Amino acid sequence: MEEKRMYHVKIKNEVKEYEAAITYHDIAKEYQKDYEHEIVLVFVDGKLQELHKRLKKDCEISFVTTADPIGHEAYKRSMSFLLVKAVYDVAGHKNIDKVRMHFAIGPGYYCTITGETRVDDDFLERVESRMHELVEADLSIKKRTVHTDEAIGLFGQYGMYDKEELFRYRRVSKVNLYSINEFEDYYYGYMLYSTGYLKYFKLYRYDEGFVLQMPEIDKPETVPHFEARTKFFQVMKESVKWGDIQEIETVGGLNRNITSGDVQETVLVQEAMQERRIAEIAQMIASRPEIRFVLIAGPSSSGKTTFSHRLSVQLRANGMRPHPIAVDNYFKEREETPKDEKGNYNFEGLCAVDIDLFEKQMQELLDGKEVIIPNFDFVKGHKEFVGSPLKLGEHDILVIEGIHCLNPKLTKALADENKFKIYISALTQLNIDEHNRIPSTDGRLIRRLVRDARTRGASATKTISMWPSVRRGEEKNIFPYQEYADVMF
């Protein structure tokens, strides 16, 4: 009898032997008891792998759970697949034209269905029930690789024309497809092992569609109640509408636009729309002479500084004299900056801002006094008081930007009638296809990499290592206050 081949696998601080071709899923089951949250992916010698993959060599393995960013995204991606499968099961293929995952609202996704299907409470109850049935059945989420031309033909047959168009512009020769039973779809990223992992979700009817509510990363077994974010939702819905009007609903549509030679006009239209909206905001501010402080808030690298300068131009066109001020210049001295639980400087919390100095100078300006605004040197880690003093005249207005500008604690000493609050973010309404979103955080991380390298003396490695802390800070310090804004952009 032929002896089975064995491989040595290092996990944590121990080395164990496993038979060749054992799945990572079987290895993960052995270690699940040591983890608070479910293991959903593995790193094999530093390379991310799905659990259905098999052991092929001596290696070192580390586990990824639903409480890790990569695992959390894989959970949401797989949950999207489960939802789409359930919708088609309940409604029937002939009654559906499109199932669209539009954008995130908190920890959930706003979705719509077009076709002969009416999205009401009864329909959502049946879809949710079907999703639970699929979870109970613990069906494998299978993966296969096909030639791109074959994928184009398949999705044409399935009526998923967004994917058919997407793959027409794909340069690689092969595509990975996933299936639950015989239902097949494409997802951009790794998936979970089976439907049995997808226990935590809730559907809420909202506006013209519904929200697929899922756990947050810090509580991966708890589904929070859906909280409507009306202003944010309307801004995103309007952006989706404009994309549809221009027939650029997905990346495939954008690629079509580029190859047809229409992209320059598309860019000009987008710029014109943005400038028109900025002009409208400036007119709103100019119509209220009591406003002396324009407060612009948004997450990291969302375009606050650029927006503040563009708004300033429009304010000048309305006869005002704007003075842009960055809250970042009011950071505490480096030696006074608080640290997080890991001993790293916490630049994202309001505690990193010298609120006393900020309040003092803003009140002095409101009282007609001269003030020298500080300039923070991020390399040296301290404020410098240089430049000409500032004094507000009748037509002067301060345009203040920073991640905490909507937090009432920052401007509690200033009267509400003197403030106009704006929330801005580089939101992504364009998706890869109807079932694969492009998270707005991805674009902001790229922007931050460039900014930190150019102006803050930080390497790409340092910026990426700090990003999880930045994201936690946004969830705590920024997003809870976005509905306080007078307008969103």
Tell where the protein language model's regions lie, with residue ranges.
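Hydrophobic anchor at the beta1->P-loop junction of P-loop NTPases
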Residues: 294-296
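Conserved nucleotide-sensing/catalytic segment adjacent to the nucleotide-binding pocket
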Residues: 332, 336-379
